[in-house]
A protein has these predicted regions:
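Conserved C-terminal helix/tail region of periplasmic/extracytoplasmic solute-binding proteins
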Residues: 162, 184, 245, 376-427
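Hinge/lid segment of periplasmic solute-binding proteins
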Residues: 99-151, 187, 192, 204-207, ...
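Extracytoplasmic "Venus flytrap"/periplasmic binding protein-like
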Residues: 55, 59-128, 137, 159-170, ...
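Extracytoplasmic/periplasmic substrate-recognition and gating elements
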Residues: 59, 64, 142, 163-164, ...
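Long, aromatic- and glycine/proline-rich binding clefts that accommodate carbohydrate-like moieties
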Residues: 131, 135, 293-299, 347-399, ...
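Short, well-ordered beta-strand elements
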Residues: 32-43, 63-68, 93-94, 143, ...
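Glycine-centered hinge/linker elements that transmit conformational signals in sensory
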Residues: 178-181, 223-254, 300
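Short, solvent-exposed loop/beta-turn-alpha elements that line the ligand-binding surface or hinge
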Residues: 115-128, 186, 192-201, 215-235, ...
Length: 427
């Protein structure tokens, strides 16, 4: 399907948006209100956020919303926002933050609790995907509200699986066997079986967690305390190395970043690829994509006897504790986290809905038919560790995972390091 111009929103959306904006009807209190919003980087689609902001401004002519963007990755955004918020900068009212950030930022006193505007956490977050009831609630306070979801999916070349009579693999060993069969039959030395992210970036946190969770294990308990099962973690890392040795994963996997996986998959050089939701549009719409119409998604494989699980990410709207326009900012957040906003972002940007019901919305499925297969994955997904020291947690997991994949550390050595360093942080 061809992406529609975001400005040509359906009349249904416009009517709903106007009604919702009307709840915040203009008045004297809104005169000359200047709101500044940090809306992330390119992957967070500031162009679509601008459409939402423009619609809000039309209904509230006393409000002007300015967008600030920056940081191509979650890590760079976290570094920038930590600097701004630590300085108690009041110039930015709202922030779009990663799902792992509420605990860190709220714990530091940087975010305004939203209970006064949204009510009790359980009721406020009940309509959304289950993961937000834990990720966005800190010490009984609503630290942020869901903007749009994200998740790691197993993308695959449905044409190649059909051509070679291969069924969707359910375990990592089955995937390895399927990939090797297709690689051998295609006689293409440049065809990778599976692409994962092994560079020391945020994606490597999920690279560590996927085969670990796939054994039915949890990394931490509800209170955030580390519950690492070391033998299971070693098995997970060993699984990746076995797939490297089998020629399924490329040998320089420790250098592979998120865009590398996207670019190589859309160039037709990969059979299976793990990546975030936004990659779908790149495969489908980019002019240089050779795989448009040839891609499908499936549940993340498991280890033997395990249960499928994936990394659920996503982006949240949070209010700065230092904002001078808190009431106005809260009204804007209410507008941005409605089912109508979720529907718009899903239909126009293939951004995963935060509301389960939107996955089956007819208009959304007309534009993004693969969402019918995404709902179960998103509902059963897990969040990366929730910690007020998430920056340190992330650094330990991703750098150690990358070192193991580079074979500068053995799996058991890497797991021992993760356990010893994080047991002091996550307790």
């Amino acid at each position: 399907m061809t992406r529609r111009d975001p400005m040509s929103m359906s009349t249904t959306w416009l009517a709903a948006a106007a009604l919702l904006a009307g709840l915040c009807a203009p008045g004297a209190a809104w005169a000359q209100t200047q709101l500044r919003v940090f809306s992330g980087g390119t992957n967070q689609r500031p162009d679509l956020m601008r459409v939402l902001f423009d619609q809000y401004q039309k209904q509230n002519p006393g409000v002007t919303i300015t967008i600030e963007t920056g940081g191509a990755t979650s890590e760079l955004q976290r570094q920038y926002l930590s600097t701004v918020l630590n300085a108690k900068d009041a110039s930015i009212d709202l922030y779009m933050i990663d799902i792992v950030n509420p605990a860190q930022y709220f714990g530091a006193g940087w975010l305004e609790p939203l209970n006064a505007w949204f009510g009790e956490p359980a009721a406020a977050l009940k309509p959304y995907l289950p993961v937000y009831a834990t990720s966005n609630v800190i010490d009984g306070k609503i630290a942020a509200m869901p903007a749009f979801a994200d998740a790691m999916f197993m993308f695959y070349r449905k044409d190649l699986l059909a051509k070679h009579g291969v069924a969707e693999p359910k375990t990592w060993d089955e995937l390895s066997a399927a990939a090797k069969k297709i690689q051998a039959a295609e006689h293409n030395p440049n065809l990778q079986g599976l692409s994962i992210q092994g560079a020391p970036i945020e994606g490597a946190v999920c690279t560590f967690l996927l085969p670990y969770w796939g054994q039915g294990k949890d990394f931490n308990d509800a209170a955030g305390k580390l519950t690492l099962d070391k033998p299971a973690a070693v098995r997970g890392l060993t699984q990746w190395l076995a797939m490297v040795d089998a020629g399924v994963i490329k040998k320089n996997v420790a250098e592979v970043k998120t865009p590398d996986t996207v670019n190589e998959f859309k160039a037709g050089q990969v059979v299976f690829a793990i990546n975030w939701t936004w990659a779908w549009d790149r495969f489908k719409d980019d002019k240089d994509s050779t795989v448009a119409g040839k891609v499908a998604v499936m549940a993340m494989p498991t280890m033997p006897g395990g249960k499928s699980a994936t990394c659920v990410g996503g982006w949240q709207w949070a209010m700065s504790a230092f904002s001078k326009h808190k009431a106005e900012s809260a009204k804007l957040i209410k507008f941005l986290v409605t089912p109508e906003a979720s529907r718009f972002l899903a239909a126009e940007g293939a951004l995963l809905p935060t509301y389960p019901a939107v996955y089956t919305d007819a208009e959304v499925l007309k534009n993004v038919p693969w969402f019918k297969d995404a709902a179960g994955v998103a509902m059963a997904g897990k969040s990366r560790p929730m910690s007020r020291d998430y920056g340190q947690v992330s650094d330990v997991i991703r750098t150690t995972t990358s070192a193991v994949l580079a074979r500068t550390k053995k799996p058991a050595e890497g797991v021992d390091e993760i356990d010893s360093r994080l047991r002091r942080v996550m307790r």
